[in-house]
Regions:
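Non-heme Fe(II) oxygenase catalytic core, chiefly the N-lobe of the double-stranded beta-helix
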Residues: 1-156
């Protein structure tokens, strides 16, 4: 795929029908031109991947707020888990602490196929995931383009 060049060496590489990888940006220090380019990429590709980021909880929230007001995280399963002082950060993890307790809201099981908060009267426009540890391969986080699915339906 051909990469699109945007402000200060920011590179948008489309990954196919859905998604793009954004390269050459530090989300903790992104300026207005980069944020605008990221928003335009999001509008076009729906799912964006930013590899190699090192964000604090404050950085994650500041970047997230460029896309609008934050919705409170849901309370599910083992209960909502947030870092102390960061109720808008929702920890999802399959890791258990030294006492055997899940450190994240979903315990150590896989989440079922779902759409984030689609049950809400006004669902959020997006979800932001920040992975601290990822497997070398696999990992079962997948995305589906409902726009592409609709375009491929027959008229019948």
């Amino acid at each position: 795929m051909r990469a699109a060049r945007t402000p200060q060496a920011l590179e948008i590489v489309a990954t196919g029908t859905l998604g793009a990888e954004v390269r050459g940006v530090d989300l903790a220090a992104a300026g207005p031109a980069e944020i605008d380019a990221i928003k335009q990429a999001w509008y076009r590709h729906d799912v964006l991947v930013f590899r190699g980021q090192r964000l604090t909880d404050d950085d994650l929230l500041a970047f997230s707020r460029h896309f609008g007001a934050l919705d409170p995280p849901p309370n599910q399963g083992a209960g909502r888990k947030s870092p102390p002082g960061y109720p808008d950060v929702y920890v999802v993890s399959n890791v258990r602490d030294e006492t055997g307790e899940p450190i994240g809201a979903l315990g150590d099981g896989e989440a079922q196929w779902h759409t984030d908060m689609s049950y809400a009267a006004l669902p959020p426009d997006a979800s932001m995931l920040y992975a601290l540890e990822i497997p070398a391969s696999g990992g079962d986080t997948c995305f589906c383009s409902m726009k592409a699915a609709l375009q491929h339906l027959t008229q019948n």
